[in-house]
Structures are given as C-alpha cells and as structure tokens.
Amino acid sequence: MELNARFVERTVSLFGEKRYARFIEALEKEPVVSVRYNVHKMLADDSLERVPWAEYGRYLPQRPVFTADPKFHAGCYYVQEASSMFIEQVVRQYVSSPVRALDLCAAPGGKTTHLLSILPAGSLLVSNEPMPLRAQVLAENAIKWGNPASVVTKNVPADFASLRNFFDLIVVDAPCSGEGMFRKDSFAVEQWSVGNVEQCVKRQREILSSVWDALRPGGVLVYSTCTFNREENEDCVAWIAEELGAEPLSLNIEVEWGVTSALVGSIPAYRFIPGYTSGEGFFLAVLRKGGDSAVAQPRAPRAQQPVAKVRNEICSWLQLSGEYDFVQEGDRVIALPKEHYAAMLVLLQKMRVLHCGLPIADIKNNKLIPVHALAMSRALNRSAFPIVELEREQALAYLHRETLSLPDAPKGVVLLAFDGAVLGLAKNVGNRANNLYPAEWRIRKDPMEL
C-alpha cells in the first residue's frame, strides 16, 4: 500500500514512530471480519471470538458470502466493523432510561441497528441520511432489524434545527477523510489530501452547529469518525466544547481492549488503531450539552385513522396490539407505539420520512394485504399466518423474487421462513405462490454465483 507522503509525515508526528510502525504493519494484514447479532431473531454464536466492547459482536474466522445466507436477509445479524461497535459503551454508561435519539449520518445502518438493540426499552430512534440511495439502504436495514420504535428520514442536517430540544441523545458519525478505512478502501487512499481533510473539518462543524438546537440541554452528543488526524478528531471535540458549550465525558474501558486515549490535549477521547485493536481505524468522543431540561413534548397533529373493521383485523396480526395506535397514510396502515405517537406524527409532518413505526398493511380493493415490514417485525404475531419452512435453495429463490411452488401449504398469505427465521410473505394460490418480497431488495447476483 503506497501512502501519500504528507499523510505519512502527519501521522508519524501524531502517533510517534513506534505506534506508527505497528500501525503500518497491521495495514499489511487482511482486515478482520465481524458481525453483530440481532438476539430478537437469532442467538449469538458463543463459539466465535467476542468483540470485547459489544455483547453480541463476534469476529468471524473468514469472510463468507453473506448474500448466500438467508438469515442475513432476515435481519438476524448485521455485518459491522468491530471498532464502531464501541458506541455500546456510551449507551451502557450514560443512557439508563428511555430516550429520544437521533442517528444523524446513519447510512448504511450499522450504528442504527446497534442502537435499536441496546437503547433502553421505551426509546425512540430517528435515523437520517440525506442521500436518496443511501437512505433507501438505511431504511431497508432498519426495517429488517424489526424494532417498531424506529423512524428513517432523508433530511439535510439543518432541517433538524426546527425540532428544538427534541432529542436526549444525538449520534454524529461524521463524514470524514476515511484514513481509518485505508486497509479496506483503496479509493480513500487515492483521494486523501490535506485539502480534503480541511474540507471535512469545515463540513463536520457545519453539521454539528446545524443540529445542536435539536439536542436538549443536558443531552448527550456522540461524535465519531473513521479517520486518524487530529483536526477531525481531538480538535473538533475541543471546538464543540468551546464553541457550542459542552462538557466532554469519560468512559470506563478495559486496558486489555487496546483502546488508545486522545493523542492531543487532555479531553477524553477514544481511538481505535489497527495493530492495537482488532478492527479498523475509529475515533469517538462523548459530550454533554450545557444546562438541563426535559425533551420537548410535542402535541400530536391530526391524523387519519383506519376504520374499526381494519383496526380489528390488523390487531390480530400483532403481539401486544394494545401498545399501538394506528394511522392511515394513503392506502398504508401503520402502527405507532403509543408512547411515541405524538413525536412520530410530528416527524411525519415536518420531515422527509421514508419509514415510520410499523407499516402493517396496504388496503387494496377493500382487502388488507400485509406488507413486508410486518413480517420483519419483532411485534409480529407469528400465529396469525401459516408458516412455511423453506430449504436453502428455496429460500434463495424467494430472495431472488422468483415464483415458488408450495403445494403443501394452505392457500392465502403465508410467512416463509428459513431455519426458523422469517424471510417474508407470499400469497399461495395453489398452483403457484406469488412472491411478495420487496422488488428493490431482491438478490441481484446470479444464483450460480452464490
């Protein structure tokens, strides 16, 4: 790997020669592969090496073809870089009661799915990505994870300024120069320049300034990057503390994890450097906004309600249906957790929402057609529909959105599963089963290549 001479000069100066030499040695090795399990759908494999700072994170001995695993598509686990799982320590040490949280730069969904697993019960997570295609991927991953207390938006950061004091916790995994991903991303190596670093610093501060009013006084900000330089890391944290008015917070960590403390100044911050930690480059700091007040409690806007007949039928499709209120957006019926009903309606009204709560069904020709998000949800009442177990080849055919034959299955809507994990829905009409898997999510790779 040939690195830019200015990058080498700057990083040696920051790391010191001994740490830099160990870092360069690690860059010549293959990246580690890690996953994080969704324990609402699948037990973590305890035969695998654990990611020490994440309860359900595991290292894999080699990289399999994830696309060929039906459980990957069912949301049973997420392929995530191990270092970035460190956000779990922030939640465990500073979030002890339900919160309203924002993952501002959330695509493709690693931190979002992690937060959906570890935030205290009763929390609401808003995940945002302004780029349309990346936002679609984010929504797909959030839906597959199956937590109904989730909203996905596609807004620019400045749009959140209108939601004053709306969030207890904001995570900004900021766009950065990507130095920490050099081992995995040759494009990041080629594109690196001091000028790009300077542009990233400017953009990061704009993002933080624009979203600051949305964090309540006393709320917690998590700032992270996947880069090494001080300008985007320690210097930016110092700027947040001084210019925006925030108190940096320390985390309790184990020495054996190999996490490196801040390399500049005395502000608490945490660096993951290949050669010292098993993962890619990562930086994280935690700050508390000055002051103290509760999050804003919005008044619920008016919303269209589904008729009683519709509501009664869909209630049978849910576990604990009494915990939800229902709204109708066009022909789509959505369940919203009662505790977040007002907040979710405000978001639907003010923001560019791609996904909200639990979409349950579409109304077509006066009939209710269950939608894929219901099949993915942990709130699904699995006894509401017949379940058909598929062999691996059948499961992959379904995920390619091919027409299936289910001669032994009852007619009507059925749940399709692989090894107990629900993959989605199909409508069995006897001689064939109409595939209801979302067309935009289908596997595009040729089956012979899997």
Regions found by a protein language model. Name each.
Residues 31-89:
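Conserved AdoMet
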Residues 128-165:
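S-adenosyl-L-methionine
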Residues 167, 220-223, 228-334:
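Class I S-adenosyl-L-methionine
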Residues 120, 215-217:
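Helix-to-beta-strand junctions that scaffold the AdoMet/dcAdoMet cofactor pocket
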Residues 108-121:
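Conserved SAM-binding loop of SAM-dependent methyltransferases across substrates and taxa
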Residues 1-42, 280, 290-450:
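Polybasic, low-complexity RNA-engagement segments
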Residues 133, 168-209, 226-233, 255-258:
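Mobile active-site "lid"/loop adjacent to the S-adenosyl-L-methionine
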Residues 97-107:
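Conserved class I S-adenosyl-L-methionine
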